[in-house]
Amino acid sequence: MSKLNMTPREIVAYLDEYIIGQKEAKKSIAIAFRNRYRRLQLEKSLQEEITPKNILMIGSTGVGKTEIARRIAKIMELPFVKVEASKYTEVGFVGRDVESMVRDLVNNSVLLVENEHKEKLKDKIEEAVIEKIAKKLLPPLPNGVSEEKKQEYANSLLKMQQRIAQGELDSREIEIEVRKKSIEIDSNVPPEILRVQENLIKVFHKEQDKVKKTLSVKEAKEALKAEISDTLLDSEAIKMEGLKRAESSGVIFIDEIDKIAVSSKEGSRQDPSKEGVQRDLLPIVEGSVVNTKYGSIKTEHILFIAAGAFHLSKPSDLIPELQGRFPLRVELENLTEEIMYMILTQTKTSIIKQYQALLKVEGVEIAFEDDAIKELAKLSYNANQKSEDIGARRLHTTIEKVLEDISFEAEDYSGQNVTITKELVQSKLEDLVADENLVKYIL
């Protein structure tokens, strides 16, 4: 299957492997992502005129809002960042400003491009690493040796490289020069402060950027890989491509958008900080220029997907200007008992398959009877009804509770086949689910 030019039908088919139901949401998102590809096939003048139709996803937690957007961005290899609206404060207050989400997107985009370039140069990087280690292991030739000696040395070097590549010398120790660990820079500060931080680091680390270390050949391979990658990669080209890709095909997923909506119950927009964040967000969604450490980026062609449960507020509680910037609205369905069962049995990497794989590491073969899976779905659904509805996330905690003893005593079950029955599920969970006061402990 192709990636960037996947059709909406192909996108939905891919999502169906991981997410059950939510047909309307999948369809809307698939069309929005396909339109990104369509726009890039047009003439430059027309490309500038076409802006993405931002999406507002409405649905309870755990119904698949984030997963739908994340899965598509991953398969199509698009710059993607997920942020929470409630983490931001308006300009002038202590906290993260909304422009930092664009800076995070650019950081992710540059990293994505860098990894692609590393993958293309993978063989070349490995060859350079192996050659450098081989030359460390073999003593250098003295000056003025004969051609015959030079040929012998070249043959020895080649054999040494082959042995290093095959891992035969992984345990041998060598002394190499490696770069000192760089100081972490906070990328969420304004670009002006970021540049000051970078300049200070350059000044203090100019002369002391390398140290000698004794490492095993295996460790040296990893240490030298990053260093040689930097020398072979064109960092400026990567930065420019990362900026361009973030600008033309970036996706920002804003979760918990309902947390910055001012509910009418709270009294006619009396929370200035929430409304302030909305007003700060507005120019970014509409289209503005944001300065990052890699350069300036225009935001009008970034696709924004906002999501929220809207239990205590309504989409209409957002300021009208922001509502207008999310013209496509999709309501996601709450999960039924049947959908819970399908999530456990039909998804490509279902929770059951994950736990089976984890316990197989300990030599324990876990099998679930169909009645046991149905009981898990039923009890998880009932827990959601009696307590907070956390959607599919409830399945993680119910299965964890059922398998708790087996996971803890895994070495006692090593080499055995363990079958999870309906009765076992009931004995582990039914008392808790039946008691409404204890439901809250099955998070």
Swiss-Prot record:
**Which keywords describe this protein according to UniProt?**
ATP-binding, Chaperone, Cytoplasm, Nucleotide-binding
Say if the entry is tagged with keyword Membrane. no
> What GO molecular function annotation could you give as one example from this UniProt entry?
proteasome-activating activity
**One of the Pfam families matching this protein, by short name:** ClpB_D2-small
Oligomer and partners: A double ring-shaped homohexamer of HslV is capped on each side by a ring-shaped HslU homohexamer. The assembly of the HslU/HslV complex is dependent on binding of ATP.
Provide the gene name from the record. Answer: hslU
User: What organism, scientifically named, is this protein from?
Assistant: Helicobacter pylori (strain ATCC 700392 / 26695) (Campylobacter pylori)
Q: Does the keyword Ribonucleoprotein apply?
A: no
Record GO biological process: protein unfolding; proteolysis involved in protein catabolic process
Q: Where in the cell is it found?
A: Cytoplasm
Q: Which family does this protein fall into? A: Belongs to the ClpX chaperone family. HslU subfamily.
User: Where is ATP bound in this sequence?
Assistant: 20, 62-67, 255, 321, 393
Q: Name one GO cellular component term.
A: HslUV protease complex
Q: Report the protein name in the record.
A: ATP-dependent protease ATPase subunit HslU
Q: Entry's PANTHER family?
A: ATP-DEPENDENT CLP PROTEASE ATP-BINDING SUBUNIT CLPX-LIKE, MITOCHONDRIAL-RELATED, ATP-DEPENDENT PROTEASE ATPASE SUBUNIT HSLU
User: Its function?
Assistant: ATPase subunit of a proteasome-like degradation complex; this subunit has chaperone activity. The binding of ATP and its subsequent hydrolysis by HslU are essential for unfolding of protein substrates subsequently hydrolyzed by HslV. HslU recognizes the N-terminal part of its protein substrates and unfolds these before they are guided to HslV for hydrolysis.
Q: Which residues form the signal peptide?
A: none
